Structure formats: structure tokens, C-alpha cells
Amino acid sequence: MAKELIFGHQNPDTDAIGTAIAYSYLQNKLGYDTEAVALGEANDETKYALNKFGFTAPRVIKTASNEVDAVMLVDHNEPQQSVSDIDKVKVTHVVDHHRIMNFNTADPLYYRAAPVGCTSTIMWQMYNEKEIEIPQDIAGIMLSAIISDTLLLKSPTTTDQDKEAVVSLANIAGVDYKEYGLKMLKAGTNIADKSEEDLIDLDAKSFELNGSNVRVAQINVVDLPEALERKDAFLKAMDEASKREGYDMFMLLITNILDSDSEALVVGSDESKAKFEKAFNAKLSDSEVKLPGVVSRKKQVVPPLTNAFEA
Amino acid sequence: MAKELIFGHQNPDTDAIGTAIAYSYLQNKLGYDTEAVALGEANDETKYALNKFGFTAPRVIKTASNEVDAVMLVDHNEPQQSVSDIDKVKVTHVVDHHRIMNFNTADPLYYRAAPVGCTSTIMWQMYNEKEIEIPQDIAGIMLSAIISDTLLLKSPTTTDQDKEAVVSLANIAGVDYKEYGLKMLKAGTNIADKSEEDLIDLDAKSFELNGSNVRVAQINVVDLPEALERKDAFLKAMDEASKREGYDMFMLLITNILDSDSEALVVGSDESKAKFEKAFNAKLSDSEVKLPGVVSRKKQVVPPLTNAFEA
């Protein structure tokens, strides 16, 4: 069987990288020949998790078709979030927990999606269904992915299935998930030694909303005032990125992981900003607005933006 | 929990109707409130199977949004094969074995697809994963769906998983699958008492191929010469349907289920016919051509047509 690459989305987070590693292990057990790779460097949080469970970061690729004819996707399906030459390879498998958008294939494929908090929760179910034993390190990296995506089970995307998976995986991994989880999340909140350009690209995704190219970035912090001291520099970096990449709107969600509140910074045309304000029923003041309780891009940001841009 | 409708594609076959019934039973066991319906009348083969296992044909609906806010799809995902107001309801679940095309959602959903011969094979796996006991009549209708889609496991779409499912389901249903299967398939081959207009619409699907609207219909027979005596009337009906519905090409695949060969009739522009000939590397003679061994629209017709229309 020809080798296939498995990867998550661009600007990978712990789910994108952790679930790729877990899926590759599972598929290889089932007779496939796969390698988990990544579409970017691991962030600090992911590095902490990889290190904790004894993994090295997956190799970073820029294109896939120079290596393989077929790939498997985790934690994404939208082509603009995938490898740059996704149209030149065949997608044979997808495991994801996002909406399906602009994902078209010529042939039938394996597709497994569920509206749960993390792709690793689906992966945990797949291991159980296939009755493949989960090694301790794989359990640890899947646990880390779920903690990351659900902000320690506090995000509104969290389902009972995520909670079950966390308890089961923490048991196999041999860690106290609350204690470990908070350490891991905090490892991802050190923004002091990173430039604004880097911070707005660490966990950023593009969405085509009714013809508009909308960028939504998110950073996790434990000290919101510290982050907002750099507001002008953030806005400048977002403005420059928008001009360079052609974004119609750029939104940065700065989330305090300790109290699950966020502050949003927004740059874009007056028309885009009006749509943003409509989406969240909130007025921007000097490009900034509080979004109390908003922590999930997928569940609390993209749907209202989609509705506002389509109205 | 609000009621949801479950249905397969337009011009329903035994998979579309049988798997909808089986999925509704499974989901209701899991706590959902669902009803299996159909987007058209059951054909003769499906009626035979429904009758054999004690089911009445599901209620036929033309629209969904007048009844429910949310639906579950089986055996299709492409919007033009679905209910006419699919854009007005939320799709919460899909179980399918086709390519994914033009299927976009605003929110995450349950999506389960695999490149196997029949949707009921995936459904059988889902019952097993959820450890829900399959009643005898549900096993019978799922068995019928797999026999129908795989032409008694002889279609090139057939996988080992389909074969396993057939053996397991036949055992639960208490039938000899070969004997029953041939009787069921033959029940669908009586074309004598149907008009050409009806026959070209019984099992027909539309595909958008690079901007062209291509219709592919299939009928199963046991006596190919009998069917070809009506060739001129078939061509006339296909031509009229094309003008009425705006098809750029209409292809009718007449398949002899006993020897797994087909004869194709084709109407359309010279340009479309040239693409057809390129797709199958075969010359049409008086709008007709033999396609030896071709029995699967999904695996042996749509992919070569897609390639030819996109070249």
C-alpha cells in the first residue's frame, strides 16, 4: 500500500498535531503506511505536550504532492486551511469536528465527523470501535488535544463525549488531567518573547464568508492587561497582514483561559466592522470590544460572523 | 428533542429507502425522534424487499421545511439529489458512500462515509459499534439494500465489508441471500408494463460536471434484446426530458444483471457525445454502445465522465 501523509490544518494547534500522531498510529496498526506531519511548527503549548509524552514534533511540510499521491486530513476539511497543493493529491480519509465547506472529491472516501469539542475525542471512539489498545504516550497526546480545544472542558463546544474521553485517556496516560491541563494551557500563554506578527499567526484561520476573506486569530493568555498594552502593535500587524494577504477583515480574539472571557481586536473596512458589530451585537470602541464568555472560534465566532456576512 | 426526517436521494432505490428505515430505527433507539421518509415512490425491486420483510413503503415528501427544522441524509449528500428545499433545513447527520460534492454546512455535524458498496454496510457497522441489536426485519431490509447496490456482490464497488455484512445480515434475517437476492433483483427488471418516460426516471441522478448538467439513468433487465426493441422510444423520451429539464447529456445504462454487461444509450449535443466517447474510449453507433462489464454508475460511469468533462 502506497504511503500517505496525515496532517491537520495550517497554523497547527495541539489537536491538529496530536490527532495526526494518534491517527497515524491507528492507521498503521490497521495496515496502512502513514506518517504524521504538520503544516507548521508546533506552538509552545503543543511543544509542552509533545515533550511531556516523549514525542518529537512532526516534520513540517509545505507541499504534499512531491512526496505522495494521497493524504488523510484531521481537524480540518476546508481547502484554504490545508496544504497548499491539496488539489494535486487525493484525500482518502478525513476525521474532523468542523463544518464542511468547499470540500469536494471525485471519488468516495472515508469521512468521519462529529460535533464534539475535539478531533481526538472522535479518534478515541475510533480506537475503541476498532478495539486497538491505546498506548500511554498516544493517550497523553490525545488528552492534551482535548484539553487544548475545550480549554479544560470549559469551552461551550465541550460535550459529554469529550468529558468521557478525557477521563478515560487521563487514566491510560497516568496523569491528573486538571493539574496537567492547566500547566499545559499556561505553557501556551507566554506572549512576552514573541512579536505581534508571530502572535497573530500562531492560531489563525481564514474563512470565506459570502465572498469576503475573513481571518480569525486567537491567543490564550493569563494576563489580559499585559496583552492589551501591545494593542497598537497588534492592530498595525493585523493591518499589514490584511494588506499583504488580502483579508477583508482581521479579528484577533485574546482569551483569558483562567476566567474564559475574551477581548477582540478588529481591523478591516467600515462595512466589515459594521458586520462584526451586528454579529456580536456590540460596538467597537477604538477597534476593540469585550466579548464576555466567548472562547470558541468555531462555536461562538464563526457562526455569528457567517450569519452577519450572509445577511 | 425536535423531530427530524431521514431520507435518501430522489428517485429512491432500495439503499435509499432501506437504509433510511434502518437509520431511523437506530437513531430512535439512541434517543432521537426521527421518521424515515422517501423522496419518491418505491420501485418494484424495493417494493418486493419491503413486502418480504413486512414493511410498508415510507411516506413520500416533496419538501421538508414545512414539517421539520432538521434532517438526516442517507445514501447521498449532493444538494441537487436531495429534497427540493434542502437549503431551508439544517442537516445534522449524513451516512453515505458517495463522493462529497457541493455539500456545505454552517455548523459541525455528524458525517459518516466510507467507500463501500452500500450505505447499509456502514449502517450495519454502526449498529455493531453502538451495540444495538438488529431486529430480523431491519436486517432483511439492510441485506436487500446491499444486494441491490452490489448486484448480489458482483459489482466492482463490492468490498470485503459488504460481503461480511451480507453474511451477517442474511443470518439474522433468516434467508438464503443468493436465492432471495436473485428473486429481489428480478422483481426490479419487469419493464414490460412501464412507459419509457417512467423507466428513464426510475433510477436516475443528475451530476454537475464542470458546468454541464449530466443525467445518468440505469435500468436492470434480464433480457437485453427485449429492452433494446424500445430503443427509439427511449431516445425520444430522453430527448424530451433533456429539453424540459435542461440536461446537456442524458445517458441510459441498461444493465443485464445476469451477466453484468450493459448497453448505453446517449442523447445530447455533439460536444457532449464526443466527451462520452472519450470517457469510455468507445464509439457511439446510432446513439448506442456496448459497455462490457460496466454495471456501476458510481465507480464505472461518473469518474470517467467527470474526467472527460473536466479535460
From Swiss-Prot, chains A, B:
Binding positions for Mn(2+) 1?
H9, D13, D75
Write down the superkingdom of origin.
Bacteria
Q: Does this UniProt record's set of keywords contain Chloroplast?
A: no
Question: Any signal peptide, and if so, which residues?
Answer: none
Q: Which GO terms describe its molecular function?
A: inorganic diphosphate phosphatase activity; manganese ion binding
| Subcellular location(s) of the protein | Cytoplasm
Q: What is its EC number?
A: 3.6.1.1
Q: Which reaction does it catalyse?
A: diphosphate + H2O = 2 phosphate + H(+)
Under the heading InterPro entries, the entry gives:
DDH_dom, DHH_sf, DHHA2, DHHA2_dom_sf, Mn-dep_inorganic_PyrPase
Enzyme class, one word?
hydrolase
Cofactor requirement? Mn(2+)
> What are the UniProt keywords, alphabetically?
Cytoplasm, Hydrolase, Manganese, Metal-binding
Q: How is the cofactor bound?
A: Binds 2 manganese ions per subunit.
Pfam families for the chain: DHH, DHHA2
* GO CC annotation terms, alphabetical: cytoplasm
Major localization class: cytoplasm
Asked if the record carries the keyword Hydrolase, the reply is: yes
Query: Where is Mn(2+) 2 annotated to bind?
Result: D15, D75, H97, D149
Fetch the NCBIfam families from UniProt: PRK05427.1
User: What family is this protein classified in?
Assistant: Belongs to the PPase class C family.
Tell me what this protein is called. Probable manganese-dependent inorganic pyrophosphatase
Q: Which organism is it from?
A: Lactobacillus johnsonii (strain CNCM I-12250 / La1 / NCC 533)
